[in-house]
Amino acid sequence: MSTDKISVLLNWHATPYHLPIFVAQSKGFFAKEGIKVAILEPNDPSDVTELIGSGKADLGCKAMIHTLAGKARGFPIKSIGTLMDEPFTGVIYLEGSGITSDFRSLKGKRIGYVGEFGKIQIDELTKYYGMTSKDYTAVRCGMNVSKAIIEGTIDAGIGLENIQQVELEEWCKANNRPASDVKMLRIDELAELGCCCFCSILYIANEDWLKDHPKETAAFMRAVKAGADAMFADPRGSWAEYCKVKPAMNTPLNRIMFDRSFNYMSQDLINVSRDWNKVTNYSKRLGIVPEDFVSNYTNEFVQWEVAPEGGEAEGLAKQQEMKTLQAHVAEHGGVLQAVTA
């Protein structure tokens, strides 16, 4: 097996949900598998698919919709597994902004988004609510959606329930406002998708590198699976390990984000075919991929027993269960609630 380091480019700066990767490194799971790994963080998350697709990084993480779009644009990338499953994603706003649960209340508002596909999603939704893309102002915010809402440069922005929504809830608490002032219009519900899988965070690979390094790829997946297993077996100990190697993680905000991410984390790392079918069809609807596009994923390197996937009914039931779980964690705390700094 090659002793060269495998470069792994994250989809974002190190974030609580990246824990299995860093724990795999710090606990020696990569070394046990005979591989060396360099974990890299991007300056701009929009560059990740291009950097992996052009061979400047071997492996990495990216959302499902970006993985599909990157392949459609000619970058040879493929998903080899899942890090985080179906985090609730939507238009986040504050009570008093003039926005309500009616999508049409976004008319005349400034809506922030991370990358270009967020704007495409909102533009597409306007068609179903008697609006056009000219009825709102799109503002590209990159990693700073929450900050832009707080500063008032946007009225709402696309974000994740376990990341940007948490940032805003904690800001509200610090400013004598109830956390319930933070609201979300879930994109999957507005678009009638039946899942939030378009923002599932995947492990992706450069296809040329993948073809030449199947043993190293399998070793990487076994190691991050061991990292995930350690997290589920001992969340508090794993969080402490993560904070040891990434001291910036050791903040109250990050602990809450981890609590809110925990239920979304993939236990078996499988690419869920039901979700891929939905998001591939959704991407065709958005015009992100052509009609003859074939989903770019493989489960070849998930070499352990996995639970049956289930059909549409099981997927919808999972979403309802997750909604209940996340509401409980938001109100009562999660796996780290007793952990102190």
From Swiss-Prot:
Cofactor needs: Fe cation
Sites of N6-(pyridoxal phosphate)lysine modification: 62
Pathway named in the protein's UniProt entry: Cofactor biosynthesis; thiamine diphosphate biosynthesis
Keywords linked to the UniProt accession: Iron, Metal-binding, Pyridoxal phosphate, Thiamine biosynthesis, Transferase
Chain ranges for the short sequence motif CCCFC as given in the UniProt record: 195-199
Annotated binding of pyridoxal 5'-phosphate, by residue: 115-118
Pfam family, one: NMT1
Active site per UniProt: 66
Enzyme Commission no: 2.-.-.-
Reaction equation(s) it catalyzes: N(6)-(pyridoxal phosphate)-L-lysyl-[4-amino-5-hydroxymethyl-2-methylpyrimidine phosphate synthase] + L-histidyl-[4-amino-5-hydroxymethyl-2-methylpyrimidine phosphate synthase] + 2 Fe(3+) + 4 H2O = L-lysyl-[4-amino-5-hydroxymethyl-2-methylpyrimidine phosphate synthase] + (2S)-2-amino-5-hydroxy-4-oxopentanoyl-[4-amino-5-hydroxymethyl-2-methylpyrimidine phosphate synthase] + 4-amino-2-methyl-5-(phosphooxymethyl)pyrimidine + 3-oxopropanoate + 2 Fe(2+) + 2 H(+)
Xref: SUPFAM superfamilies: Periplasmic binding protein-like II
Taxonomic superkingdom: Eukaryota
Leader peptide range in chain numbering: none
Coiled coil segments of this chain: none
Family: Belongs to the NMT1/THI5 family.
Its job: Responsible for the formation of the pyrimidine heterocycle in the thiamine biosynthesis pathway. Catalyzes the formation of hydroxymethylpyrimidine phosphate (HMP-P) from histidine and pyridoxal phosphate (PLP). The protein uses PLP and the active site histidine to form HMP-P, generating an inactive enzyme. The enzyme can only undergo a single turnover, which suggests it is a suicide enzyme.
Quaternary structure (record): Homodimer.
Protein known as: 4-amino-5-hydroxymethyl-2-methylpyrimidine phosphate synthase
Organism of this sequence: Uromyces fabae (Rust fungus)
The encoding gene: PIG1
